[in-house]
């Protein structure tokens, strides 16, 4: 069929259009992580429980590249930091956690255990369930779907609270970023930023 020809209804129905997203790991990346965890010593029949132990820790502590995870995994001789290290060889920690967001959301809701870092993210108590940084995975159709779907759909207020917190973090990061091309103290004079502290205002809500 020529590229300038529209497909027939039957031809279109026969085509596969799988959902994909650059915000979650690909099947190939998950296979690579599986291989890495197996090499680390994670039992093949416990791969998912180890993955979810990591996601659960990030649900509370965050999934940025700077997060420090402590404590053991379900295998006492393997730490959560080691599992995170395997993941980060292939993809970002946040993308990995985002893939399992719906699973950990259901599990923590069932136990009434909201994310521990919601107050640190400046999220109000009534929106505390929005206080984890891969929350958007709940609305990503490419993320792993639990049997029966989400036990509770995020409310519009929770979505807004999480997006506001995410935007605030981005503005704070940009405010503290140095635009110097060198890290030499001859240029930086030991300062972490080359600009004076200043108030950063979020843009007005769009109509």
From Swiss-Prot:
GO terms for molecular function: structural molecule activity. It comes from Plantago asiatica mosaic potexvirus (P1AMV). Its main location: virion. Required for genome encapsidation. Forms ribonucleoprotein complexes along with TGB1 helicase and viral RNA. It is found in: Virion. This is Coat protein. GO terms for cellular component: helical viral capsid; ribonucleoprotein complex. The keyword Cytoplasm does not apply. Keywords: Capsid protein, Helical capsid protein, Ribonucleoprotein, Virion. Belongs to the potexvirus capsid protein family. The keyword Ribonucleoprotein applies. Transmembrane segments: none annotated. Pfam families: Flexi_CP.
